[in-house]
C-alpha cells in the first residue's frame, strides 16, 4: 500500500544524475505514480539547458525497469519567471495527469536558496529528503561535459549512454563552443 497516489518531483534534470535517481526510487516506494515536472521545457537549448524535454524523458526512463517506467509520468513546465504564474502552471499540468480525488505529495530536498519553490505548494504534502549523494549539483557536471568529460561516478548507466551518444551530435559541438566562449545565449536552431 502506498502513502500517495502521486508524488511530484520538480527539476530541470540537466542532466539526470544519481541524486535525482535516488529521489525517484524513494518516490516509487511511497507512491503509485511519480510525476516529473521537467522545468525549463521551452524549445531552446543553451549551456544551462542543453537537453530538450523529450530528450530528458528518454534519458531518465533509460535508467528504470519497464515496470517502473509505467509509473513515471512527465509534465513540461516552461519558464515564466513569475512565481504565481509558475505555480499555477505546475498545478494545472499536474491536475491534467492525475485522477480526481487523488492524494498528491511533493518530494524534494532543500539544498540551497534556489529550493524555495518547494514551499509554494502548501496543499501538497511535502516529503522532504535529507541530503542525497552529498548534494551533488549538475552545474559542474555540465561544465565537465562541455570539456569532453563524462563524470561517470555521478550518473546512472542510462544517463552515461545518453551523454555519450549526445557528444557525437552537431548540437553538442555547438554547445561546447558556446561554453568555451562563455556564451549563455540560445542556439539559433533546434536540432
Where are the regions a protein language model picked out?
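Nucleotidyltransferase catalytic core that binds NTPs
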Residues: 1-191
